[in-house]
């Protein structure tokens, strides 16, 4: 949420026009700008293991519940990302299905796992995590938040994730600044 304080004689900022009226910027769109996972330019890897929750919390969407230990949830590659928190790092880092990322026709594993849990309850919990599930890289988090590719981040990996999560996404900041500029300068 943005709160703007502008004198009444300076005009009222209008909400920005959506920057993506016909096509939302999806997680897949953001990640497709980067080099292949694990190669230079996309190799600030998170080493936290992914383990399923012993007592998963289900929501209607497989991307909304707590199906894994920690606060890192799987990202829906076909939708805009939820806000990336400053607490990313370790098991709070979002999860990517690398197989579904590389092959868009393949349904993400999380969908079938969620269906099993929804249908069969706790008896469907598995500890067998497929090797193609992985954590988001620093570069991927930055791309999702619309930072320029190749931007340098400081400190250890957890500090880099915190910088990305604490910042206003650049495209959002630009849209808000333009709305204020238009209100003040016409």
What positions do the PLM features span?
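S-adenosyl-L-methionine-dependent DNA methyltransferase catalytic core
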Residues: 1-186
């Amino acid at each position: 949420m943005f709160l703007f304080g502008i004198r009444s004689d300076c005009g009222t900022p209008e909400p920005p026009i959506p920057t993506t009226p016909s096509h939302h910027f999806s997680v897949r769109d953001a990640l497709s700008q980067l080099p292949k996972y694990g190669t230079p330019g996309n190799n600030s890897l998170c080493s936290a293991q992914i383990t399923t929750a012993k007592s998963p919390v289900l929501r209607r969407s497989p991307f909304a519940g707590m199906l894994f230990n920690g606060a890192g949830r799987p990202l829906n590659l076909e939708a805009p990302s939820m806000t990336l928190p400053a607490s990313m790092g370790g098991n709070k880092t979002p999860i990517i299905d690398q197989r579904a990322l590389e092959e868009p026709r393949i349904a993400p594993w999380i969908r079938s796992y969620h269906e099993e849990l929804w249908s069969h309850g706790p008896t469907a919990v598995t500890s067998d995590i497929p090797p193609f599930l992985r954590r988001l890289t620093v570069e991927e988090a930055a791309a999702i938040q619309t930072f320029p590719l190749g931007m340098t981040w400081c400190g250890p990996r957890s500090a880099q994730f915190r910088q990305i999560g604490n910042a206003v996404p650049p495209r959002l900041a630009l849209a808000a600044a333009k709305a204020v500029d238009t209100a003040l300068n016409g």
